[in-house]
Amino acid sequence: MANSFLDSLTLVRQNTPLVQCLTNSVVMQFTANVLLAAGATPAMVDTPAESAEFAAVANGVLINAGTPSAEQYQGMTKAIEGARKAGTPWVLDPVAVGGLSERTKYAEGIVDKQPAAIRGNASEVVALAGLGAGGRGVDATDSVEAALEAAQLLAKRTGGVVAVSGAEDLIVSADRVTWLRSGDPMLQLVIGTGCSLGALTAAYLGATVDSDISAHDAVLAAHAHVGAAGQIAAQKASAPGSFAVAFIDALYDVDAQAVASLVDVREA
Amino acid sequence: MANSFLDSLTLVRQNTPLVQCLTNSVVMQFTANVLLAAGATPAMVDTPAESAEFAAVANGVLINAGTPSAEQYQGMTKAIEGARKAGTPWVLDPVAVGGLSERTKYAEGIVDKQPAAIRGNASEVVALAGLGAGGRGVDATDSVEAALEAAQLLAKRTGGVVAVSGAEDLIVSADRVTWLRSGDPMLQLVIGTGCSLGALTAAYLGATVDSDISAHDAVLAAHAHVGAAGQIAAQKASAPGSFAVAFIDALYDVDAQAVASLVDVREA
Amino acid sequence: MANSFLDSLTLVRQNTPLVQCLTNSVVMQFTANVLLAAGATPAMVDTPAESAEFAAVANGVLINAGTPSAEQYQGMTKAIEGARKAGTPWVLDPVAVGGLSERTKYAEGIVDKQPAAIRGNASEVVALAGLGAGGRGVDATDSVEAALEAAQLLAKRTGGVVAVSGAEDLIVSADRVTWLRSGDPMLQLVIGTGCSLGALTAAYLGATVDSDISAHDAVLAAHAHVGAAGQIAAQKASAPGSFAVAFIDALYDVDAQAVASLVDVREA
């Protein structure tokens, strides 16, 4: 059945995966609330003194260098080491990579440390693959379609899943390309919906790691969960303040059947 | 009268205590909004260059090492010095102590600097007392009952009040043990409800320091205020996004009588 | 026509100015959501390695030293250099200047680097002008009227616009003084409404820089937009949690005519 990937939503709620987020200060609160509403447990342990230790007990790790202090860069490097040693899946969100030189260099340095998934917008994925110059701040200037080659290149290089967020989302692994139509444009007007999707991707990977659900399906399910919640929120709210509230509510309320009926999945 | 502790709510609103929060980046915004809604004034002055100076003008200080950068640790140490010199009550929230070694060492180093109150979950309080290993990230794995001995030990050692948050809250000082039944499970699904309770505890201590209300009653009242607001919010909302909004509203709207009628206080 | 300044709201929505915010951790999320709701694009690029580079592509820069780490101070200095070199307008929000010695010294050091606008409360503006001692944390203890001389002094010294927030707002440039009556007292109970107004001021300046709208009118319009949204929110909500949601909604929904009909502008 085409929507079997949705079983992972049930696993997230059953396993309440502990997700360690090394992420930017702008979205920490929202990311934590997204994880809690979705059924996961957040912990923003990001200092070099603690991040490796914690990555060994976490079920998933998010690395998002959105506002990277020197100390947080060190914390990220340590967390990745800790995650790899412990076999904890980690997710790379290359925020604004391409657009800014220091973080581009940093992301290029960690992309080969086997992230289980990469999640970004088209311009970030294109830039991370070395195929383009990046977007405008956190906004993409490339189309999702234009990022397909870059995503495939990165998927092969990392052995992980690469997800490109946009009007339609693109989920790519070495031998599979899936398109997901879901969500609502209003998601762009609430800060942190993209960044927290990176964290939720880590939650889904952590919750399904011992199941027969593939990493590709887990990443797809995380995106479908967020997209469906965006659609439900858009039915209830038409401005971004109340939309953000309705979005968190919907992440919590929505069940797998509702997600399946709201989103459109297409294997390419 | 059993609920005389509730007079402190009135004092918070009259005195608008200035609460200096050295807290983690995840909950800064929510903590500030909780303080404002409850009637206090927040100021997150946390750098070593300014924290001691500010602790002398603040009415209460919160120390919560949830995402502790090296610089913030220094700021905390300075703030505690400034608070003690000025006689400003300070509150220790030992987030994830026990679970992570560096912050455990730090918390053990400051616990003897006479915090007016300690507020944590059962596992954190047990670990801080040296009686156990801590929880899972920010989640408790010990029951509140199991933390009674640790709370009493810490209360005697510090001369302050120790509050253990859980299904029922436990408020302990050297010669008194109070159980508080209040709140709603949904509070666990909104990030920062626990951390902001630490800040509100500092607000209540600061607002009542020159009154005849005991520190024990002030800490109890802070917990009752939050618990009652959680109950009111749960009557209005059944998912965490709208619950968080209703919780802030209820902190602002609720009066002492309503708190008294909603919570259940039991001296042990 | 007295309300011609309101054309700048249309320009903000047309041009979606990219606003680089070097601001305090407490209000980053709220500031980003305010900018998005108003029609701008936020980017919190604040490290010394990236801030100058980004200031050259941003349309406006906000400098708000609310929780200033040593690294963020360096980032601010670099961002101002980058902004000046590129001709990007930058806004100074002197949070708690006067009340705390280190940030006062820092603000005094950058005030002569030609901020396009300064936005603060009365006590902050008075202290920045060297005419008084500052307020209580982030709260003003001077009246807006009492800050007129300080605002005029700073406007002449910087060549920019100086805005004093209060019960009525005061917008001052070298040869013009405008009073704005708008807003609602509930705005004071939501953290970040003042700080995000600084960011929105940068958005308005950035969006109108190539138009025939004066910087004075752009700053005035930013304040009117926020004030009107506060008034609309106050019609829908009577407690700060739901007020904050309604405020973001109103920033998004309100059009120039509605702003004009809600606020009261008076040239002095």
UniProtKB/Swiss-Prot annotation, chains A, B, C:
Superkingdom of this protein's organism: Bacteria
Catalytic activity: 5-(2-hydroxyethyl)-4-methylthiazole + ATP = 4-methyl-5-(2-phosphooxyethyl)-thiazole + ADP + H(+)
Pfam families: HK
Cofactor: Mg(2+)
GO BP annotations listed: thiamine biosynthetic process; thiamine diphosphate biosynthetic process
Record: residues binding substrate: M44, G192
Keyword Kinase on entry: yes
Keywords: ATP-binding, Kinase, Magnesium, Metal-binding, Nucleotide-binding, Thiamine biosynthesis, Transferase
UniProt binding sites for ATP: R119, S165
SUPFAM superfamilies per record: Ribokinase-like (SSF53613)
Enzyme Commission number, as recorded: 2.7.1.50
Molecular functions per Gene Ontology: ATP binding; hydroxyethylthiazole kinase activity; magnesium ion binding
Functional pathway: Cofactor biosynthesis; thiamine diphosphate biosynthesis; 4-methyl-5-(2-phosphoethyl)-thiazole from 5-(2-hydroxyethyl)-4-methylthiazole: step 1/1
InterPro entries per record: Hyethyz_kinase (IPR000417), Ribokinase-like (IPR029056)
Summary of the function given for this chain in its UniProt record: Catalyzes the phosphorylation of the hydroxyl group of 4-methyl-5-beta-hydroxyethylthiazole (THZ).
Family label: Belongs to the Thz kinase family.
Record protein name field: Hydroxyethylthiazole kinase
Natural source organism: Corynebacterium glutamicum (strain R)
Lineage: Bacteria, Bacillati, Actinomycetota, Actinomycetes, Mycobacteriales
